[in-house]
Amino acid sequence: MKKSKSKYLTLAGLVLGTGVLLSACGNSSTASKTYNYVYSSDPSSLNYLAENRAATSDIVANLVDGLLENDQYGNIIPSLAEDWTVSQDGLTYTYKLRKDAKWFTSEGEEYAPVTAQDFVTGLQYAADKKSEALYLVQDSVAGLDDYITGKTSDFSTVGVKALDDQTVQYTLVKPELYWNSKTLATILFPVNADFLKSKGDDFGKADPSSILYNGPFLMKALVSKSAIEYKKNPNYWDAKNVFVDDVKLTYYDGSDQESLERNFTAGAYTTARLFPNSSSYEGIKEKYKNNIIYSMQNSTSYFFNFNLDRKSYNYTSKTSDIEKKSTQEAVLNKNFRQAINFAFDRTSYGAQSEGKEGATKILRNLVVPPNFVSIKGKDFGEVVASKMVNYGKEWQGINFADGQDPYYNPEKAKAKFAEAKKELEAKGVQFPIHLDKTVEVTDKVGIQGVSSIKQSIESVLGSDNVVIDIQQLTSDEFDSSGYFAQTAAQKDYDLYHGGWGPDYQDPSTYLDIFNTNSGGFLQNLGLEPGEANDKAKAVGLDVYTQMLEEANKEQDPAKRYEKYADIQAWLIDSSLVLPSVSRGGTPSLRRTVPFAAAYGLTGTKGVESYKYLKVQDKIVTTDEYAKAREKWLKEKEESNKKAQEELAKHVK
């Protein structure tokens, strides 16, 4: 059985929506060397080889380097690997390591050189520890599945080899055009064997001294619900591209939205996420009328999903077993789920965090971003839309582009609910159906968002038919019932809102997360990966998994993406997940230089990284940002084209 935890994200990350995510702009006056802002989720550990949650990987991206990284245009460029080659058959990738890369302790003391064996050690450790990210590599690296499943105990049979101190080689099961993008995931990062042995079970615990550093920064402080601090690694192999000396992040629980702007105005923060619905926003808007920037939407998608097999009821408004049973029957009914989908007013939901002006700027309507890949000159989203005609007239003419709501339709919602109610009453279901949705009690935007959903669904379908019960929890209760719950049975809700950032450049990175055998998001649906469940079969996830397996066999990019468009269309029609918003698309103020930071659609070396980021004294203007964005987009197109052409040089 292959089981994984997802590199999924909580709503808290969405609410902040800034940090270096904008890669925003300004003039060239770069006096400051410190980046100050906030963070919203403590990491459970720093074990980048075993963990796969964003709370960990976003930190480690700044502390540990892998083979490759992203530049400011999203190209994959050398990092610890100076160069690489791939065999003609696409099965063997060989990386030549730089000789000046070193490991350092958290105090900055040199520990050892980085060698090819460190990458072998890293993957073996990840396999032995049953890493949450094994789904990324288990079926990719030759022999790894046999080692993980116990068919062999000899790791030397696995397709990762240290040919010498400076050469590491991976042999794949089948060609993967996107393999290099996988090397940006922390499961393929190196680790020093001697240090690993010396730490034992303490390796990677939530303490700066628990790991070694070969990246741009050293962690100087990690205090739960208080602060995270980094200092530039002066001996880093690429120190010339690290322009910030100190990074200081202060814990933010969402209870005092105005504090972000206050600290920015006082000079304590480098950036500030703005909340258009806050009581002080009109004053802020007048004060900073020439400085408010809306960031671009990025590749992280958020969506609601139903718990198909709920076992825990610690946080519920249900008072009887018949209410619990009725809800379980309802969420298994496709017409009911579609009714909820069409009754969900996403524009109103977006307005709770972005105000009326920016309400649609964050909306995303597919799990796979509509422009993530193209198929014969058409965006992925366009092709998915063309597939929807196969699923009924309710989907005709739908547009899945970002930044608008194609779903909200009270007439469709009522029609679907009428069908659902007839089917459910025949099974003895009692109405209204109660759906529990948890939210942190300190998360003002989250509470406003859930309240908006409650209002739109109950007003369209009637509170005598459906009731959204808002469960306001403490931070620890919220985490333990959702994001940090260890099993599907511990997931304590009927509706969940989470996000997924892509691990590699292929639609499967999003759609595989619901695979019944290994899906990284499956537990959030109340299902355990690899375990038979009649609820999964009842909603068609067995068919969905078969479609994934067939698509994964296809190596021709156009044909492959076409198959994944079919799968995305199936998922939309099923309404098992309800796409909502993306990261980005949010208003902020900042003092960072124009599009200097790394940019990436996948992995951990893009928006998460402070390498390349430049801080300045002057506040960025809206006009400066617009001009810089236009310039960057043009340069990006040219740079990406050149990088694509140069790939052929690596085939040997």
From Swiss-Prot:
Lipid attachment in record (N-palmitoyl cysteine): C25
Signal sequence bounds: 1-24
GO biological process, one term: protein transport
Cellular localisation: Cell membrane
Keyword field contains Membrane: yes
Membrane topology according to the record: Lipid-anchor
MF GO annotations: peptide transmembrane transporter activity
InterPro entries, A to Z: Peptide/Ni-bd, SBP_5, SBP_5_CS, SBP_5_dom
Presence of keyword Lipoprotein: yes
Record keywords, A-Z: Cell membrane, Lipoprotein, Membrane, Palmitate, Peptide transport, Protein transport, Signal, Transport
Stored Pfam families: SBP_bac_5
Residues with lipidation of kind S-diacylglycerol cysteine: C25
The protein's role, per its UniProt record: Part of the binding-protein-dependent transport system for oligopeptides; probably an oligopeptide binding protein.
PANTHER family: PERIPLASMIC BINDING COMPONENT OF ABC TRANSPORTER, PERIPLASMIC OLIGOPEPTIDE-BINDING PROTEIN-RELATED
Record-stated family: Belongs to the bacterial solute-binding protein 5 family.
Full protein name: Oligopeptide-binding protein AliB
